[in-house]
């Protein structure tokens, strides 16, 4: 497996959360449904999605699945974008 040292993990996490937030908003996914699926408080979920920095994996997966997105697609796209930025 290839090492991607040039990728900024903090920026990658922020990009993934931002893409997830956008999808949650576009699909009108409720914080309650994400909370029910993840076990986190809906206010905490909302706060972390709005910060666009990082969030626990369990919460992120619940947000992705509840909004009907593909977690692999979100991660893959974000990694490709971060790789392109690192190479520029």
Language model features: what each stretch is:
Residues 1-29, 72:
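A short, Lys/Arg-rich alpha-helix, primarily the initiator
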Residues 38-54:
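Recognition helix of helix-turn-helix/homeodomain-like DNA-binding domains
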Residues 68-87:
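Short C-terminal boundary/hinge segments that cap the last helix of small helical domains
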């Amino acid at each position: 497996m290839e090492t991607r040292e040039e990728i900024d993990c903090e920026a990658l996490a922020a990009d993934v959360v931002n893409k997830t937030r956008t999808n949650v908003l576009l699909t009108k996914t409720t914080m309650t449904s994400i909370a029910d699926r993840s076990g986190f408080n809906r206010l905490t979920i909302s706060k972390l999605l709005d910060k666009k920095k990082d969030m626990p994996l369990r919460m992120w997966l619940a947000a992705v699945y509840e909004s009907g997105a593909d977690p692999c697609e979100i991660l893959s796209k974000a990694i490709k974008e971060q790789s392109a930025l690192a190479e520029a």
